Amino acid sequence: MASMMQPQIILLKEGTDTSQGKAQLVSNINACTAVGDVVRTTLGPRGMDKLIHDDKGSVTISNDGATIMKLLDIVHPAAKILVDIAKSQDSEVGDGTTTVVLLAAEFLKEAKPFIEDGVHAQNLIRSYRTASTLAIAKVKELAVSIEGKSVEEKKGLLAKCAATTLSSKLIGGEKEFFATMVVDAVMAIGNDDRLNLIGIKKVPGGNMRDSFLVDGVAFKKTFSYAGFEQQPKKFLNPKILLLNIELELKSEKENAEIRLSDPSQYQSIVDAEWNIIYDKLDKCVESGAKVVLSRLAIGDLATQYFADRDIFCAGRVAEEDLNRVAAAAGGTVQTSVNNIIDEVLGTCEIFEEKQVGGERFNIFSGCPSGRTATIVLRGGADQFIEEAERSLHDAIMIVRRAVKNSTVVPGGGAIDMEISKYLRQHSRTIAGKSQLFINSYAKALEVIPRQLCDNAGFDATDVLNKLRQKHAMQSGEGASYGVDINTGGIADSFANFVWEPAVVKINAINAATEAACLILSVDETVKNPKSESAQGDAAGAMGRGRGGGRGRGMRRR
């Protein structure tokens, strides 16, 4: 009787929304599956694009998984995990963002029937982690090294990796053209990890084929004062001076007080201001530099002064561009014009100012360090150029990863089918429920070739049956067979040069499995009402302030 009289224990604030148990887990799985369905159709060379229109009126056309996930304003807490893994895949390897979201959604979809039948989530998580370890080991075993090849052979192999990535993008029609450009750019910077050494500059207008690669640095002409017309626009082997100071005549307006005993002294004060700027300009000229760049303003006086002495100058150069010139030309950015020595000056074979479309560009080519490159992108609509830039970023990341890791695997769903077959065979050696869970993981991996077929308009069931038959061959010669997008059948992905770096697949399997396990491990969601009640209180206070307090027990005046 005493136990029945115990008062109710209230832990959470009134209005807190809690949901738990099997229904909550299934709800989270459904939300993640819905997110997977959004990006599903963007996979592969025949994938469709998404047009996203935000509240500010800007329009984005993209089929890049990470870009779409960022722009979708997802509010479901579990589904946000898929947004995070897409972002991490993009920053880590650059490509495979749609793949990682699709795999995570498919792992959860396959887990759903087991959860509904009462299987404990931890049993699934344990089996999924085991399957993930086996899958990654198999990818490493099947990967082919590109180490030890000649430079030309290596370039050819890397171009194939870049072309595989670009084939699913908006610029897929010119994938060979851009793949070669990307490989040349990555090879130019060597082993340097700084991604900003490869610049991408967009110039609206013209054709995609009008895009070109600068073996050095190119940036849009900065704002110039009167007098720049007389400056030379081309130099051979010039010395380049990089500054981070203003070269502008400025009168001291604040914190300045001058007391004169004689009016004739006034002129000497004015002359001193002029002498300071002329002294700076003289030192720049004495350094022997023919090109002067500064991150801060170079005024009209300095512009005309340099023009009279056949020196080119540009002020307000973006910090990123200035640093890239320093890396390429071998100079050092100076914060003073005193004691400028030859060692701090950069150089290049050719400097020229050139018209590109409706813009003028300053181009430094043939730089001694050769550790920078710039891709100048041309195209019609702004949205098209934006998407082309994202596509090239993905391709650059992929090639850099392939250079570093030096291993590639067959694309077109071939590696996914081979891992799936391997896991099915392995599951037969395991007794108990775990056999079913690993088998469902293996089935989920088939989503990649199946979706490639669906997006291309082929009969996925027929193609998958052919692939299963080919991969089941004991000799192992069918291990590299994947979907042939051109014929609607199957083909050897290695022979067709459909390759991708092994690190992309390893990262995708790892991230997708971790995300699926994370969502499966959540059994309760608690929604705190604090923010909502705070907004309600604020609104109520405003209402009372406008006389809304009447009828609430307040005395009328």
Curated annotation (Swiss-Prot):
Chief localisation class: cytoplasm
UniProt cross-references to Pfam families, sorted A to Z: Cpn60_TCP1
Segments for region (Disordered): 529-557
GO molecular function, one term: ATP-dependent protein folding chaperone
CDD domains recorded: TCP1_eta (cd03340)
Keywords on record: Acetylation, ATP-binding, Chaperone, Cytoplasm, Nucleotide-binding
Basic residues bias: start-end ranges: 547-557
Compartment(s): Cytoplasm
Subunit organization: Heterooligomeric complex of about 850 to 900 kDa that forms two stacked rings, 12 to 16 nm in diameter. Interacts with KNAT1.
Function: Molecular chaperone; assists the folding of proteins upon ATP hydrolysis. Known to play a role, in vitro, in the folding of actin and tubulin.
Name listed for the protein in its UniProt record: T-complex protein 1 subunit eta
Species whose genome carries this gene: Arabidopsis thaliana
Gene name, Swiss-Prot/TrEMBL: CCT7
